[in-house]
Amino acid sequence: MLTVPGLCWLCRMPLALGHWGICSVCSRATRTDKTLCPQCGLPATHSHLPCGRCLQKPPPWQRLVTVADYAPPLSPLIHQLKFSRRSEIASALSRLLLLEVLHARRTTGLQLPDRIVSVPLWQRRHWRRGFNQSDLLCQPLSRWLHCQWDSEAVTRTRATATQHFLSARLRKRNLKNAFRLELPVQGRHMVIVDDVVTTGSTVAEIAQLLLRNGAAAVQVWCLCRTL
């Protein structure tokens, strides 16, 4: 997908503000039309009440905000952000996530955080890629929402196997004790920001770490939730 300055990256129509990257029509069109559980973010009967899965076995976070399923048109943009060094895409994707957060705040009273944290990469992967895509999403979000963010708030303690090829059980084992908290979170409302949440194993491990260290509440914000 080619990004052209001044044109919407999805429909190629002129933009009122060129740096947005995605026009308001396409921004609305990217949102999922499925009813999602407000806690786990998976398809559910009601969008304002936890689903049966969460009532039986709730995840270690209280809310999950997502824009859409991991599918076109967002999936190609996320792929370019991560693997083609297209970091200019991050601001446009961050804006999509911001619009979803503000929508959830208007419709459900979503609480804004005291601090947002990135999902960290292992040092070698960060060095190879040159950036952490989660950091690129957090940077504008923290500025727009006037909340704290530090790219080193959570760090990885070791390399882990690629999650994509592991079962849910092995993903959980793979991530056990893989993260370390570097800043105090006692009594704070925290948000974990990631580009894609699949099984939720990674954000669950970080959420548990935050709660063990005294966080008052944890939310997860992501561009895409695999539905």
Curated annotation (Swiss-Prot):
Xref: SUPFAM superfamilies: PRTase-like
Null mutant phenotype: Mutants are unable to use DNA as a sole carbon and energy source and show decreased competitive fitness when cocultured with wild-type cells.
Pfam hit, one: Pribosyltran
GO BP, sorted A to Z: carbon utilization; DNA catabolic process
Cross-referenced NCBIfam families: comF (TIGR00201), PRK11595.1 (NF008616)
Record-stated family: Belongs to the ComF/GntX family.
Task of the protein: Required for the use of extracellular DNA as a nutrient. Has been suggested to be involved in gluconate metabolism.
PANTHER family noted in UniProt: DNA UTILIZATION PROTEIN YHGH
Protein name: DNA utilization protein YhgH
Organism: Escherichia coli (strain K12)
Source species taxonomy: Bacteria, Pseudomonadati, Pseudomonadota, Gammaproteobacteria, Enterobacterales
Gene giving rise to this polypeptide: gntX
